[in-house]
Amino acid sequence: MTDKMQSLALAPVGNLDSYIRAANAWPMLSADEERALAEKLHYHGDLEAAKTLILSHLRFVVHIARNYAGYGLPQADLIQEGNIGLMKAVRRFNPEVGVRLVSFAVHWIKAEIHEYVLRNWRIVKVATTKAQRKLFFNLRKTKQRLGWFNQDEVEMVARELGVTSKDVREMESRMAAQDMTFDLSSDDDSDSQPMAPVLYLQDKSSNFADGIEDDNWEEQAANRLTDAMQGLDERSQDIIRARWLDEDNKSTLQELADRYGVSAERVRQLEKNAMKKLRAAIEA
C-alpha cells in the first residue's frame, strides 16, 4: 500500500459525530462508476480513483464497526481499524471478478476489526483517571470486607473517598465484570462457563454486504422521501401525512375532503399525484 493510500486510512477520526456525517455525505457510486474507477486504479495505479472508492465506502466501515460496540473499545478506533481493512480491499480489488467492492471489502474490514478487538479487549483499563484509580484500589479492600454494597454503603464509601455515588457504582460494576478468555476449549461446559468474547465476533463465513447495502438503500430512500415531501405543496403534504405517515390516526378520504372543502374524489386524485411524485423520487 502506498504512503498516500495509507494516510487516507489512518487519518484521525476526530469528532466522531462529525466524521460519521461526513462519511454518510459522500455519494454512493453506481456499478458503472465503481467499475470505471476500479479499472483506473487496477490498470493505471490512479490514486484519485482510489480516493473516491475509499471515501464512497467509509459509511460501510461505520456500519460494520457498530456491531463491535459491546467490547468497551473506542468506536473511533474500531472505525479507524476498519478503514485500514477498506484500504487493503481497495488495493486488492479486481474489477474483472464481477462483484461489487462492498461485497469484497466487508471481509477485509471485519478482519482488521477482529484483530484489533482480539488484541485489545482484555487490556481495557478498569481505572483510567486518578480518581478512578484511587477508587479502584480502595474499593477492592472495602469489598473484601463488605461484599456487594447496598445504597447506604455506596454513599458511605463515596464520602470516605471523596467521589460520587455514581462513581462507586460504576467502578463496582467494572470490578464485577469477569476477565474472560477469548478461546474456550471444546471441553468447556457452555452452561457453567461465561461465553468467550470470540463467540460474540461476527461469523466470518457470513456475507453481510447485502444487509449493509439494504440498510444504506433504506437510509438513502428515507432522505429522498424527505426531500420529495418538501417539494410538494402544503395540502399534498398534509394528505400524505394523514393518509400514510400517521400510524395512530389515519384520516379517511372523506375526512380530508371535509377539511379542504372538496370532494373525496378530488382528495384521491391529489393523493395519487403526490404518491407518484414521491415514488419517482425514491426510485431515482
Swiss-Prot record:
Any one of the GO CC terms: cytosol
Motif Interaction with polymerase core subunit RpoC in this chain: 77-80
DNA-binding region: 253-272
UniProt induction comment: Subject to complex regulation at multiple levels (transcription, translation, regulation of activity and degradation). In the absence of heat shock, or after heat shock, activity is inhibited by transient association with DnaK and DnaJ, which reduces the amounts of free active RpoH, makes it unstable and mediates its degradation by the FtsH protease. During heat shock, the intracellular concentration of RpoH increases, due to slightly increased transcription, increased synthesis and stabilization of the protein.
Any GO molecular function: bacterial-type RNA polymerase core enzyme binding
GO biological process: DNA recombination; DNA-templated transcription; DNA-templated transcription initiation; regulation of DNA-templated transcription; regulation of DNA-templated transcription initiation; regulation of gene expression; response to heat
SUPFAM superfamilies: Sigma2 domain of RNA polymerase sigma factors (SSF88946), Sigma3 and sigma4 domains of RNA polymerase sigma factors (SSF88659)
Effect of residue 80 to N/R: Decrease in activity. Exhibits reduced affinity for core RNAP
Alphabetic keyword roster: Cytoplasm, DNA-binding, Sigma factor, Stress response, Transcription, Transcription regulation
CDD domains the record matches: Sigma70_r4 (cd06171)
Sigma-70 factor domain-4, as annotated region: 228-280
Disruption phenotype: Mutants exhibit an increased sensitivity to heat shock but only in the exponential phase of aerobic growth.
InterPro entries in the cross-refs: RNA_pol_sigma-70_dom, RNA_pol_sigma70, RNA_pol_sigma70_r2, RNA_pol_sigma70_r4, RNA_pol_sigma_r2, RNA_pol_sigma_r3/r4-like, RNA_pol_sigma_RpoH_proteobac, Sigma-70_Factor
Region (Sigma-70 factor domain-2): 53-122
Subcellular location: Cytoplasm
Domain characteristics, as noted in the entry: The sigma-70 factor domain-2 mediates sequence-specific interaction with the -10 element in promoter DNA, and plays an important role in melting the double-stranded DNA and the formation of the transcription bubble. The sigma-70 factor domain-2 mediates interaction with the RNA polymerase subunits RpoB and RpoC.
Family: Belongs to the sigma-70 factor family. RpoH subfamily.
Subunit comment: Interacts with the RNA polymerase core enzyme. Interacts with DnaK and DnaJ.
Note: May only be involved in heat shocks that occur during exponential phase of growth under aerobic conditions. Different mechanisms may play a prime role during stationary phase and anaerobic growth.
Function: Sigma factors are initiation factors that promote the attachment of RNA polymerase to specific initiation sites and are then released. This sigma factor is involved in regulation of expression of heat shock genes. Intracellular concentration of free RpoH protein increases in response to heat shock, which causes association with RNA polymerase (RNAP) and initiation of transcription of heat shock genes, including numerous global transcriptional regulators and genes involved in maintaining membrane functionality and homeostasis.
Protein name per the record: RNA polymerase sigma factor RpoH
Protein species of origin: Escherichia coli (strain K12)
Native organism taxonomy: Bacteria, Pseudomonadati, Pseudomonadota, Gammaproteobacteria, Enterobacterales
